């Protein structure tokens, strides 16, 4: 969360194995809602990362509690470590994310809106129209029709499915296509 510093390695590995890796970040907003932010290039992602670094509390990570926060190269070798705790909320508002990410040649959409934690719907009860999202992410097992009943604002949005996996071995093998 709140970093793109491992995207250069991920993109290199993807290129070597013929897998498309889209540079991105799962941002934690001021409202403690997670938003997926995807970028055209690694450079755009890293520029956004720099912006986010200036908007995250300077709380030191405690690896014994929260785990290590390493930056790795394409060979899984440690090349750096992030000292600030990354799981905290930034001071970036959910209503500002879409326009902000666009400035960095990216797109953004609220993550796992069907979940009871760290989703915009859990935090605010709905997706605010001021946020101007045109898509939203549902978890793999979510009932899209039920979610649309609970959150009518989803009717006008493209719904994407994702596992919210944070480790490769937890990613499903299903393939999805998004026309860009």
Regions found by a protein language model. Give the residues of each.
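Metal-associated gating/positioning segment near the N- to mid-region
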Residues: 1
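Short low-complexity stretches enriched in small and charged residues
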Residues: 59-68, 88-95, 112-118, 133
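Charged catalytic cores and adjacent phosphate/nucleic-acid-binding surfaces used
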Residues: 4-46, 99, 104-107, 114-180
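Active-site gating loops and adjacent loop-to-helix segments of metal-dependent hydrolytic enzymes
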Residues: 38-83, 126
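Internal catalytic-core helix/loop-beta-alpha segment
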Residues: 76-78, 82-114
């Amino acid at each position: 969360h709140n970093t793109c510093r491992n995207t250069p390695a991920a993109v290199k590995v993807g290129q070597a194995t013929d897998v498309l890796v889209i540079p991105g970040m799962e941002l934690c907003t001021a409202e403690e809602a997670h938003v997926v932010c995807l970028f055209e290039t690694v450079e755009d992602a890293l520029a956004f990362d720099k912006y986010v670094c200036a908007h995250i509390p300077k709380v030191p990570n405690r690896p014994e509690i929260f785990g290590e926060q390493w930056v790795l190269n394409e060979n899984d070798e440690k090349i750096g470590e992030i000292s600030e705790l990354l799981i905290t909320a930034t001071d970036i508002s959910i209503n500002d994310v879409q326009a902000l990410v666009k400035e960095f040649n990216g797109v953004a959409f609220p993550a796992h809106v069907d979940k009871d934690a760290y989703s915009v719907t859990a935090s605010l009860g709905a997706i605010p129209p001021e946020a101007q999202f045109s898509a939203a992410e549902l978890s793999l097992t979510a009932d899209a029709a039920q979610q649309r009943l609970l959150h009518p604002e989803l009717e006008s949005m493209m719904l994407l499915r994702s596992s919210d996996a944070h480790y490769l071995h937890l990613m499903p093998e299903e393939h999805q296509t998004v026309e860009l």
